Amino acid sequence: SQLNRRNLGRRAGRSLVTVGSMAAGAFLVVSTGAFRKAPPASPTDLKSGTGGFSFWGESAVPIYDDLNQDEAISLFDLNRSLLLGANVVPLRLREGDDASCLNLNNALRPKIFGIKVSDFEGRFEFAEGNWSSLYQKPDGGAIPALVDQNTLMWAMKMGIGGRLNYVDGEGNPLEIEVVGALKGSMLQGALFIKEEDFLDKFKQQGGYLSFLLTGDKDDA
């Protein structure tokens, strides 16, 4: 309108700041949305960010039983119909620093998952390395580990070959070396090592505290 045009000419500096702020805000919204990842068309796709897993659960206390067996299903009074056709993949866990996007600080010692490599072969995509990289033998007796690429870059602020210092279950110094990085996965915020290495270095961390499940999400 004529009033708006007159106001722009009267206080051009203030008007320029207002228009610039609105333009910057619109740019931030659009640019942030460009990085948004769409969910996979099928969560059962082994190469998607879910690795073909439909659910990720945690336990407040260690579980020592195989949740795929009838004995464990009866012991914990689990719903058999929901677990029909599903497979439960257990993970050992050693707690550590928060390495998620909620932590703006450098994660020096992220939590560690101990996994059975055979349960993960063929799942997820890698920016570098693969699950077989966990069988490498780094110099100095370091333990090989895999981590999500985004966690490695932004939370840990290091690259492939970087090392982190821990203390094992017996109080001895322990080095863990990053030997590979997953690409765009849900496995962010933690390191993943072989179960054999986990049991060797963290004997006191008995049982399983985290579980990945395959199956149809519509049956939940």
Which ranges hold each PLM region?
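Alpha-helical transmembrane segments of bacterial inner-membrane membrane proteins
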Residues: 1-220
